[in-house]
Amino acid sequence: EAPEAMAVDAPRAEREPKRARTDVHAVAPAAQAVQVPPRPKDAGWEDLDKDDVDDPLMVAEYVEDIFAYMRKIELQCMPNGNYMSMQRDLNWNLRGVLADWLIETHAKFRLLPETLFLALNVVDRFLSLRTISLSKLQLVGVTALFIAAKYEEVLCPSIQNFLYVADGGYTSEEILRAERYMLKVLNFDLSYASPMNFLRRISKADNYDIQTRTVAKYFMEISLVDHRLLDHPPSLVAAAAVWLAREVLERGEWTPTLVHYSTYAEDELLSLIHISEP
């Protein structure tokens, strides 16, 4: 048979050029590069700051930067959540007793909520850095409240008032000496962003509901007694308190606007909400 005939009758696979195979592994990175980005957790939120542009007291132009700064410094002012392991004479129950006493004393003096939160923060940060004896625990507490009142209040109670609530257990010289020492240990850093700061921001997305705000403040206050919350930033405590208050009062779902102004989605709050469960 002629060679020409054999060429004509050659199989189709031999007559057509082979197609290059696609390398799946080579394409994968490119496919990943064009993936649709995840949906923001606050997608669909409403801008409530735009209504305050003409109000200089609301500083709408700077409010985002202000709270971004607060979220930064709140991490710098958090105590060691396990500081009791370095204390020889103290335990968490004694810390709870001190917190109860400070809450009661704070109420007697009718001080601002910020004063109470700062006082407990000073106590916990100081005890994270120094070991003390049981006999000095109340001195640390009363001095911390004295420091916080000076920092937050317009009219700070006199040192004689603090001597009275301490039942004469310390002299004014001891409190003043403790004040100097504690501030030195803390490097004079009292720039604490308390849950109250973040509660005000979140309340904006809650239409400043007075009932929700009041119940949330109650939850925030009792959180001071529970040492298990020391590892959680104040912004998270505030958001969880508002979420729980809204649940109790049946105020509806955790909206994208609440997510935006609190910076926490609902699933980020649940671990803190259920922290007291067995």
Sequence positions of predicted segments:
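Acidic, serine/threonine-rich low-complexity regulatory regions at protein termini
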Residues: 1-142, 146-276
